Amino acid sequence: MYSDKKNILQLVALLIEHGVSNIVLCPGSRNSPIVHTLANHSFFNCHSVTDERSAGFFAVGLALHGGKPAAVCCTSGTALLNIHPAVAEAFYQKVPLVVISADRPAAWIGQMDGQTLPQPGVFGSLVKKSVQLPEIHTDQDEWYCNRLINEALLELNHHGKGPVHINVPISEPLFQFTTPELPKVRVITRYQGLNVYDRKYDDLIERLNKYSKRMMIAGQMSLIYLFEKKICKLLYKHFTWLSEHIGNRIVPGLPIKNFDAILYATPEEEKEKLVPELVITYGGHIVSKRLKEFLRKHPPKEHWHVSLDGEVADLFGSLTTVIEMDAFEFLEKIAYMLENRQIEYPKAWEYKSRNLPEPEFAYSEMAAIGGLIRSLPAESALHLGNSSTVRYAQLYTVPETVEVCCNRGTSGIEGSLSTAIGYASASQKLNFIVIGDLSFFYDMNALWNGNLHNNLRILLLNNGGGEIFQALPGFKMNERTHRYVTASHQTSAEGWATERGFSYSAVHNAEELAAAMSAFTQTEQPSEHPLFMEVFTDKAEDVRLLKEYYHQLKNSSQAQNI
């Protein structure tokens, strides 16, 4: 029987899956649940060494002899510090050493309890990875614990070998050994490159062809990649391709971009048909919260993430494989390995996408965004502010030749204007910036810089505060809360924009919007000055129109059985 501590069970099961069989065990009470579970499983070759300093070096020797990772397990407190010299040796000799330390719960560190010191990160830069496991009480705790252990064990051989540290907090009671078997655990594997002549990749390609419901999701990328026509033909029909405007042109064909609206409009009982078996992601961040929730609620059997850095990014909680290589090289290689058979899954998504019309909003900030996107000149650049702006833009079709930029690395509202102006200063294209009022006024001294050129055109959406917070489902605000959450204001940018040399126009209704948009997007006569259009709308009306649109979308879709 094994320990009842779920973080220990995850750890031991994953040590087995990652092939760490040589374990050096040091005496102690806090680590006894780990020791008991390891010592009573036939997979492990256990060695008893009392002195932790010697135990660490003993484990280094085991790893050096076979070339495979070895582990050392110790109790809490200064016992862990005694392994430090061995960790340093393993780091500089590039030995795959796993240091497993038991610990007291974080609440008791620094409270004069026995054998306690701050153990997480104690080895500093001398380990390739250091993780602090959670004690598991919820499904999310279990997912997080599993991911951390996988991350640590994957680093043993990532870009060279070296030591890792796994700190395991264990609450009392310590000695409940009531678990008859180890759990089945999610194992994350990493492939570095994709050599088609290497037999270890046969399994990967076999798994790829096993699934008929395959989804490819392209995240943010600030580039255009032109696939050969042959590659497009081989790849496109085998997957449902999802991308957002910030993905630009990185898909071999036309991706589905209105998937957020599709997921909203599709009744819950019909969503099962849309659930993929395999998801492959590449590129950076994804804006759609609805897509993330959908794939977390309905996890695919496998999720592969392709990236040059090979980092673990478990966005949907179902990551199984990291493929460390250029995404486009990966796509071009698998194109020739896909079995040529009829795949119906993409058609379900494509049908729903085709039958969802673009919205037609009355005068509002959504109408202003749509009006600009429909009028964008070819070969221009579109910079989207964060929060509501980037989300509302996704409701419309952006011309393929338009570059789309947005600060989605951390998705904050600060710096969007400065980033866009910096980009425009180095660009020969017309650069259109769409930004909300809070984001603009937060970063308004971006206009103070002396790098404002006539290729710059700013569309400021001013509805007197952060209306997106007003639209959050389930969040009902009283007047006092509303003031602070939405940061209501009565500020105009006119004085500052004209002071900084912009040709300024104010818009208050649909007629003014149409007239101003024509001048704002025209390319026949180059403007002598950068342009600034401030569109004033009503917060409450913006929210009402948005909710009305989604309500109609759901009703219309159900009526048409989309």
UniProtKB/Swiss-Prot annotation:
Q: Which GO BP terms sit in this record?
A: menaquinone biosynthetic process
GO molecular function terms listed in the Swiss-Prot or TrEMBL record: 2-succinyl-5-enolpyruvyl-6-hydroxy-3-cyclohexene-1-carboxylic-acid synthase activity; magnesium ion binding; manganese ion binding; thiamine pyrophosphate binding
User: Which pathway does this polypeptide act in?
Assistant: Quinol/quinone metabolism; 1,4-dihydroxy-2-naphthoate biosynthesis; 1,4-dihydroxy-2-naphthoate from chorismate: step 2/7; Quinol/quinone metabolism; menaquinone biosynthesis
EC assignment: the record states 2.2.1.9
Cofactor(s), names only, from the UniProt record: Mg(2+); Mn(2+); thiamine diphosphate
| UniProtKB keywords | Magnesium, Manganese, Menaquinone biosynthesis, Metal-binding, Thiamine pyrophosphate, Transferase
The family database entries (Pfam families) matched by this protein are listed as:
TPP_enzyme_N
**What catalytic activity is recorded?**
isochorismate + 2-oxoglutarate + H(+) = 5-enolpyruvoyl-6-hydroxy-2-succinyl-cyclohex-3-ene-1-carboxylate + CO2
- Domain of life, per UniProt, equals Bacteria
* Cofactor: record remark: Binds 1 thiamine pyrophosphate per subunit.
PANTHER family to which the protein is assigned, alphabetical: 2-SUCCINYL-5-ENOLPYRUVYL-6-HYDROXY-3-CYCLOHEXENE-1-CARBOXYLATE SYNTHASE (PTHR42916), PROTEIN PHYLLO, CHLOROPLASTIC (PTHR42916:SF1)
Record text on subunit structure and interactions: Homodimer.
Question: HAMAP family under this entry?
Answer: MenD (MF_01659)
Name the job this protein performs.
Catalyzes the thiamine diphosphate-dependent decarboxylation of 2-oxoglutarate and the subsequent addition of the resulting succinic semialdehyde-thiamine pyrophosphate anion to isochorismate to yield 2-succinyl-5-enolpyruvyl-6-hydroxy-3-cyclohexene-1-carboxylate (SEPHCHC).
The family line of this record is: Belongs to the TPP enzyme family. MenD subfamily.
Q: Can you say what this protein is called?
A: 2-succinyl-5-enolpyruvyl-6-hydroxy-3-cyclohexene-1-carboxylate synthase
Species of the source: Parabacteroides distasonis (strain ATCC 8503 / DSM 20701 / CIP 104284 / JCM 5825 / NCTC 11152)
